[in-house]
Design a protein with these regions (language model features):
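Aromatic-rich, lipid-facing transmembrane alpha helices and their immediate juxtamembrane interface loops
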Residues: 1-106
Length: 106
């Protein structure tokens, strides 16, 4: 039995947004590598195999590596990623600034 995305996806989004908002302004190579490995391994832990496979596809199509050089670019990548997931699930997409407003109202 798979866990419904309505249960786990908001928590994943909150976690990744929190990580991106606290990402270093000027990360060093060790930090970049650790974040890269974390993001690349996320699909393994998705409680819904089709969504995990979709996440793997997104990571192949839109790799995180070029966006790990600054906090702002990582934040924008996380936002972009969740809009892709929302489209796949026929959920509402939001602008970058709307996503920040929603985060801080959480």
């Amino acid at each position: 039995m798979k866990l419904r995305y309505e249960i786990w996806l908001p928590h994943l989004k909150f976690t990744l947004q929190t990580m991106s908002l606290n990402y270093p302004l000027n990360p060093n190579e060790v930090t970049i590598r650790k974040y890269y490995n974390f993001i690349q391994n996320l699909p393994i832990f998705f409680p819904d195999e089709p969504m995990g496979n979709y996440m793997s596809t997104l990571l192949d199509e839109f790799p995180v590596a070029p966006y790990l050089n600054s906090r702002r670019s990582f934040m924008k990548w996380v936002h972009f990623l969740f809009n892709k997931i929302n489209k796949k699930l026929n959920l509402r997409t939001v602008t970058f600034y709307e996503s920040l407003e929603e985060y801080y109202q959480h």
